Amino acid sequence: MHQIQNYELEIHYAGALPALEVKNILYSKLSINSNVRPSQSPVERPIVPITEDKIYFLPDASMQQAKVYFLIDGEPYAVKDAVNYMAFNEYFGGGFSGLVMNEIREKRSMAYSAYGHFSRPPKQGQMTKFTGYVGTQSDKVLDAIDVYMSLLDSMPQYPETIENIRTILRQSVLSNKPTFRSKSQRLTANMMLGYKVDPAMLQVRDIQRLTFDNILSFYQSHVQGKPITVLIMGDPGLIDQKQLKAKYGKITKLSKSKLFSN
């Protein structure tokens, strides 16, 4: 606790009191040092890069449903690419209209739930990461992996969906307003990403210019051909590990006791 007090902190207040009065109250109630060290928050923790395709399996005989995750290293985040990230996420994993749900659940009934998207880091320049997921029956794991991997390797193209994607993104951006009490946090978060104006102003402009070729180019540079880590959790007695190994190579088994402490 003593070390924490030696670092700068950020306090957000929403209310009717004047700023100076709020400051005096905080200084009287909190142990705030005058000479503090600069904070490095949010800290970007080092991550082991994904350099080759790998499959990990965490056995759990109690699981009624198997869970399969797909991980791909992304690129350093830049706000100029914000709409491209949003558009790909919507096209590839955007709910029931996205490729993942449509190809895996609607067409083939292989999954209870499925998604795939790039996550945005809190600061510009930090790394993005793609996370895909399929929740399916244990006896359908291999088939579900086959379909998902084919989507990542050779994404189906439906250019006619672009107008609907533009409409969804435009509505999302324009309706994503901070509440009264969260305005200052939103402003700080936007500044951390590198924005100097309201992101919606830039994003609406880029959405209007968005074409399907933008989504395709993003996929080709951020997803296609990149090494993939697959993590499977499920009942080892119901998942055909021999067939999985024959098709995808070595499977590294994980242990709950080593991953999680009691």
Regions flagged by a language model, labelled:
Residues 4, 48-51, 61-63, 105-109, ...:
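A generic structural signal for short, non-catalytic loop/turn and secondary-structure boundary residues
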Residues 7-9, 54, 66-70, 81-83, ...:
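Structural beta-strand/beta-sheet cores of well-ordered domains, especially the beta-sheet scaffolds
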Residues 69-73, 93-135:
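A structural supersecondary motif
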Residues 78-81, 104-107, 193-196:
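Short, structured coil/loop segments at alpha-helix boundaries
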